[in-house]
Amino acid sequence: MSLSTTAFPSLQGENMSRSPIPRHRALLAGFCLAGALSAQAATQEEILDAALVSGDSSQLTDSHLVALRLQQQVERIRQTRTQLLDGLYQNLSQAYDPGAASMWVLPANPDNTLPFLIGDKGRVLASLSLEAGGRGLAYGTNVLTQLSGTNAAHAPLLKRAVQWLVNGDPGAATAKDFKVSVVGVDKTAALNGLKSAGLQPADAACNALTDASCASTSKLLVLGNGASAASLSATVRARLQAGLPILFVHTNGWNQSSTGQQILAGLGLQEGPYGGNYWDKDRVPSSRTRTRSVELGGAYGQDPALVQQIVDGSWRTDYDWSKCTSYVGRTTCDDVPGLSDFSKRVDVLKGALDAYNQKAQNLFALPGTTSLRLWLLWADAVRQNIRYPMDKAADTARFQETFVADAIVGYVREAGAAQKELGSYAGQRQQSMPVSGSEETLTLTLPSAQGFTAIGRMAAPGKRLSIRIEDAGQASLAVGLNTQRIGSTRLWNTRQYDRPRFLKSPDIKLQANQSVALVSPYGGLLQLVYSGATPGQTVTVKVTGAASQPFLDIQPGEDSSQAIADFIQALDADKADWLEIRSGSVEVHAKVEKVRGSIDKDYGGDVQRFIRELNEVFIDDAYTLAGFAIPNQAKTPAIQQECAARGWDCDSETLHKLPGTQHINVDQYAQCGGGCSGNPYDQTWGLNPRGWGESHELGHNLQVNRLKVYGGRSGEISNQIFPLHKDWRVLREFGQNLDDTRVNYRNAYNLIVAGRAEADPLAGVYKRLWEDPGTYALNGERMAFYTQWVHYWADLKNDPLQGWDIWTLLYLHQRQVDKSDWDANKAALGYGTYAQRPGNSGDASSTDGNDNLLLGLSWLTQRDQRPTFALWGIRTSAAAQAQVAAYGFAEQPAFFYANNRTNEYSTVKLLDMSQGSPAWPFP
C-alpha cells in the first residue's frame, strides 16, 4: 500500500467529527433540562470549532468536551503513525548508534511529523516529516558516512526509508540511476552512502535547493549543514510542497547549527538542545523490537495515557504524601513514589508547547498543529473554572488537573482568555486594568551585555498586546512576562496551591520591526530580555494594548521629581497589584502592598528618601564594600593608598566589574524560605532599604569561596558582612540601632575557651565552632570571626572609620587572585611560593577559603596571623603556612576582640589570648 499521501488529520485536511455529548448529562432528570443541556453543549461545540481557528477561548468553559476532541485527534495521529512506521520497519533490525557527536532531531508539528528512531533513553535520533504534503527524513548525524561501518546494520532500514521518500512506498524500489541533488554535504560521500544502502543513485549535478529547474527533475534532495539559500526555511518548505523529497543529515556533530535549525524548521522539525547526544549517548539497541519502536513513535509527544486520564477524570488518589519533606517553609514531594514520572510527562508537554512560545510562533496560524491547539484550549477551559486554594491530598482531582493545565500556556496568539481567579498572585483589579488603544513608544537603555530590564508596562489578563522593537544592533531580544521563580508557587504545601504554577513566561523572541501579538491568562509585568548587547545602547520598543502599573524610572543625573510625583499618584490611585522601580543598578518587581507598607511605616511616606536609601544605603553600600569599580566613584584615599603600596590594580573595570542589574522580587512567596538569593532574589517581607534581610540576600550574590571559612559552613555567614556593615553605618549616620544582638561574641569566646582546654586545641575549637554542618548553625558565633578583622584593622590604622576597609581590600585581593595574570602578579598578591593559581573550592572539607583568608590577612596586616586562625579552629594547608612563614613577618599573638553590642564599636575590648584565656570583660 502506498503511504505517499498519508497525512495526519488536521484543520487543513479534514472536518473533524465532533465528540458526543457525555452520557451522564443525558441522564439528568427531565426532558426539558436534557434538551437545554444539549443545546448548551452544541454551543460549546461551536465555540470550540471557532477557537480552533482563532485561538479565542474566552467563552470556552467545557474542558471535558475539549478533552474528548483531543483524544480523538491523538488517536487518529497514533493510528496514522503506526501504519507508516510499521510499513517502514517491517522485520528489519532496529539497531542504530549515532554516537556522542550527534544531535537530536525532534518533531515539532505533531500532526505532520513523527519520530523515526527513538533511543532507549527516549531521545529522538531521526524524524520523519509529512509537512506541506511532502515527505522528509532528518538524521542527527551524517548517517550516510556510517553505513559501511558503525551503522552497517541500519543500511536496510535506511533503504526502505529512502524508497518511501522517493516513491511514497517503502517497498517500492527506486529506479536505477535516480537523480539525487546533494547540497551542503560532501557529494561523493553522500552518494556512496546511498549505494551502501543498496540504492543506485545518480548525481543530478545541480542544486535542487536553489534551482527550480533542477528540483523538477531530481528525485531526492540531500541536504547538510553547509546548504544556503535566501529564506532557507521557506525554500525547504516550498520544495517539499512541490513534491521533492528531502533527506537532511546533520553534519555539525553535537553542536547546534543555525543553518540546520532553518532546514529543520522547513521540514516541520526542530533541533535538539546544546550538546545534543553528547551526554546521553542514546542509541537504538539491536534487541529493540519492531512492536516497541512502533509503540514509542505512535505515542511520542502525544501522551495518550495522560489524555485518557483527563477524559475519564481517573486521577491517581494513592500518592504517599508522607514522603514529602519541608525546609524553611517550602514543601517538596520529589520522593513521593510515582509523582516524578507524572511530573516529567507534564514537563515534556510543557516543553513542546514552550518551543513555539520561545520562537514567537502562533500555533493557531501554523498548519499541522491541531493536537497542540486542543491541548492549549483544554488548558484554557480548565483555567476558567480554577478556584484557589487547593490541597494535594484533599483536592486530588482538581489539584492534578490544574497541575497539568498550568504547564500549558500559549502566549503567542491573537486572542485568548483570562484566568478568572489568580489567587495570591493578583486580585480582581488586575482583570479590569485599562489598556492603551494606541501604540506607545518606549526607549530603554540596556545596562549590560545580557540580562533583562523592565519595559515599564504590563499585560492585562486575557487582553491582546502587540509588541515590536526597532533596530537593536547586534543584540538578541525577547519579551517575557513576570519575574517569579517556580518556587514562588508553594503548591505542595498544605492548602497553598493558591496561584498559577508558572507565572514567569518563557522568553519570547523578538525580531526587529516584526510585531508579536501576545495574550496571557494571568497578565504580568513586561520584561525586555537581551543578550549580545553593547552596554549603554538604547532600544525603542513599540507596544499596543498594554496596561500601566505604578512604575518609577530614576535616571542617573536627571531630575526625578516629576517621575516620583507620577509614581506617588499612581500608588495613591490604588488600581494595580504590582509595581516596578528601576533605579541605578537595581530593579524592583513588587506587590504594591509590600512596598507601600514600608514607605508609609518606615519612611513616613517619603518616597524620595526611600529611593535614595535604596540606592545609597542598600545597593551602593554593598558594592562599595565589595570593592567594585563603580562609575564616577573613586575608591577612598585609604583604599587607594593600600592598593598603590602593594602594586595592586584596584581600578580595572575588567577585574572589578560591577555585577549586572540586581533584580528583586517582593512577593507573597519566595523561591525558598522567606528570602532567597539569586538574580532576581526574592523576599516576602516589605522592602526596606535598611533591612537586614535585603542585604543578607544581596550578600549571597556577592559572597565568594575564597572568603569563606570551611566553604559551605560559612555559606550563611560570609554574606552577612554586608548587612553588618550597613547596620554599623545606619547607627553612625542616622542614629538608628538595628539588629544589635546579631553577633554573638560572648558564646564564640566561650566555645573557644572550652576548645582550647583539649589536648588538641585547634581540633577542640573546630569541633565546637565549625563542625556542625547545619545551614544556620552557630550563625552569630561564626560572624564574630568576620568582625574580628574589622576591629583589628581599625586598631592597626588607628582610625575606627577604616575598619571595614579590610573586607574591601580582601575582595579586591581575591578578584586579582582569581583573574589577573598569575605569574606577573602572584608575588604582589602574597602568593610568591605558589607555582599555580590556588584552588577555589567551596567544599567544607577544603581549606581553599581558609588558606586565602590566612594569606590575604597576613599579607595586608604584615603580620603572621597563624596563631589567631588556630585560636578559632581554622585549619590551613601546609602550602599556605609555608607561604606565611616565607613572608618573614613578626608573629601576631592570638587575639580576641570582645563586645556586647553588634553595631557600636566604641565598646570593643581587645583580649590577649597568647597567655591563656582572660576573663570576659563585660557583665
UniProtKB/Swiss-Prot annotation:
Top-level EC class: hydrolase
Pfam family, one: IMPa_helical
Keyword RNA-binding included in the entry's annotation: no
UniProt keyword annotations, A-Z: Hydrolase, Metal-binding, Metalloprotease, Protease, Secreted, Signal, Zinc
Active site residues according to the UniProt entry: 697
Activity regulation details: Proteolytic activity is blocked in the presence of EDTA.
InterPro entries in alphabetical order: IMPa_helical, IMPa_N_2, Pep_M60_3, Peptidase_M60_dom
Top-rank taxon, per record: Bacteria
Family designation: Belongs to the peptidase M88 family.
Descriptive protein name: Immunomodulating metalloprotease
Organism field: Pseudomonas aeruginosa (strain ATCC 15692 / DSM 22644 / CIP 104116 / JCM 14847 / LMG 12228 / 1C / PRS 101 / PAO1)
Lineage, uppermost ranks: Bacteria, Pseudomonadati, Pseudomonadota, Gammaproteobacteria, Pseudomonadales
Gene: impA
